[in-house]
Amino acid sequence: SEGYPVYKQNRRQMIEGNLSYKQAMEELFGNLSVRYSRSTTPYTPYQQSQEGYLISSYQEGENNRNQFSISASLSKGISWIKGYIFLDAAYSDSRSLLVRNDLKVPNAQRTWHIVPRLETDLFRWLTMKYKLNYAYSILALEDEETATRNISLNQQLSLRFSPFAKVSMELVAEHYHN
């Protein structure tokens, strides 16, 4: 089959607010961001069931997508560990439309992210960094009892050895889970 050219452009409107906080002498920093956006595309995702398979494509027709997101970050220096702790968190709610088997189906996707980190100089010659990245998302189609859920977890640990002023060696380990 052959596609057709789309001469229309995407449109997007967005409003965003940001709030920052810092106490430099206490090594405390924070940030909060809130965003709402609305976009319109000249095509709509299209899904058709054929012989037990779900065929995905696009069809001509405007599709509106509304998205709300909020994110926050916090960091704090801690002298007794000679380092910093960080915490990043985010939430997003996105709503749009798709066409499945010639029926318009509203859908919503919600995503949560949490990312704690630790960076510390255990000794003058040894630096440790640890990061955990956790994400959870749900895709729900209106009028369907089940929703698609996805969980992912990623951990990373790095150790940097610096036995001499101009020599360093780093060991990195990662673990993934989906």
Predicted regions and their residues:
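Exposed, low-structure sequence patches enriched in small/polar residues
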Residues: S1-N178
